[in-house]
């Protein structure tokens, strides 16, 4: 899912940059001759963790536009663009949210919704999706993305990411402390402060733990996808269009689909890789929709 990948990647980058800057400014100071100040570290981790997640959320829309080259439709130049605008407007009214920006970008069949607030979101679809699906199926995809916005998934995920970030920042520094103590235990000139071992370990652990923690975010995302599918069915008055859209996408390239298809839940990754998948298997999604009939 493109919006999830962008959010997580941006979040990891923001946290890494914040850590480096704060360390250079001397704010990252929890170690003294008395040892590691855990309460102070926890407060610091909470502030950095949630600040990083919030910054990632606030810049999610411009980042998505930039990374995909999405062109926001301000004045429809074709009947397809006019239909897209009209469809999103109708779906948004049914969902009770303000009209999102609508964008189109070149690429494989894909779609995403992003934005910091329900009433200032962005819904984007690829040219590949428009070319490979019927209008009924495209409308189902649009309904799915509008449901994400109406459900407040980006904001909710920010809270989840903030909690995850807190643990990542906290644990990275605890590990850094013990590694640094081990490296400097024979240094008679050590004054109990932070050494190079601490700095390097924290930076490495932060990236590694951040990637590992994305498993939690992915698990959360998979559960939100079922809600978005159900939301699309409610907006359209029937689960059939969404089922058709998923089936269509599943048949575009059986068993071997490009990474870009992740946003529509087609990348049914086996084994260990499934832990990092932001979407449940397409068969499970269709089965869940079928149970609504």
From Swiss-Prot:
The active site is at 145. Gene3D superfamilies: Metalloproteases ('zincins'), catalytic domain. Its EC number is 3.4.24.-. It comes from the Bacteria. Zn(2+) binds at residues 144, 148, 225. CDD domains: M48B_HtpX_like (cd07335). It is an enzyme of class 3 (hydrolase). Pfam families: Peptidase_M48. One of its GO terms (molecular function) is metalloendopeptidase activity. The chain crosses the membrane at residues 4-24, 39-59, 159-179, 200-220. It is a multi-pass membrane protein. InterPro entries: HtpX_protease, Pept_M48_protease_HtpX, Peptidase_M48. GO terms for cellular component: plasma membrane. Keywords: Cell inner membrane, Cell membrane, Hydrolase, Membrane, Metal-binding, Metalloprotease, Protease, Transmembrane, Transmembrane helix, Zinc. It is found in: Cell inner membrane. Coiled coil: none annotated. Binds 1 zinc ion per subunit. GO terms for biological process: proteolysis. Its cofactor is Zn(2+). HAMAP family: Pept_M48_protease_HtpX. Belongs to the peptidase M48B family. PANTHER family: PROTEASE HTPX. This is Protease HtpX homolog. It comes from Herminiimonas arsenicoxydans.
């Amino acid at each position: 899912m493109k919006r999830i990948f962008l959010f997580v990647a941006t979040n990891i980058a923001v946290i890494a940059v914040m850590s480096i800057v704060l360390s250079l400014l001397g704010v990252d100071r929890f170690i003294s001759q008395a040892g590691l100040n855990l309460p102070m570290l926890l407060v610091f981790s909470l502030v950095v963790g949630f600040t990083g997640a919030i910054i990632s959320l606030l810049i999610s829309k411009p980042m998505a536009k930039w990374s995909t080259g999405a062109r926001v439709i301000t004045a429809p130049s074709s009947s397809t663009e006019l239909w897209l605008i009209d469809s999103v407007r109708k779906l948004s009214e049914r969902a009770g949210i303000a009209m999102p920006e609508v964008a189109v970008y070149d690429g494989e069949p894909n779609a995403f919704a992003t934005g910091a607030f329900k009433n200032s979101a962005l819904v984007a679809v690829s040219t590949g999706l428009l070319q490979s699906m019927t209008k009924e199926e495209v409308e189902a995809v649009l309904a799915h993305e509008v449901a994400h916005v109406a459900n407040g998934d980006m904001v909710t995920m920010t809270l989840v990411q903030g909690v995850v970030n807190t643990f990542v920042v906290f644990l990275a520094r605890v590990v850094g402390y013990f590694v640094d103590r081990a490296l400097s235990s024979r240094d008679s000139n050590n004054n109990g402060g932070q050494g190079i071992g601490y700095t390097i370990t924290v930076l490495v652990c932060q990236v590694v733990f951040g990637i590992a923690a994305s498993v939690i975010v992915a698990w959360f995302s998979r559960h939100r996808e079922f809600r978005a599918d159900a939301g699309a069915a409610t907006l359209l008055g029937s689960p059939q269009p969404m089922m058709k859209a998923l089936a269509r996408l599943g048949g575009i390239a059986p068993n071997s689909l490009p990474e870009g298809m992740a946003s529509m839940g087609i990348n049914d990754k086996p084994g260990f890789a499934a832990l990092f998948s932001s979407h449940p298997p397409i068969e499970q999604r269709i089965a869940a929709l079928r149970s609504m009939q």
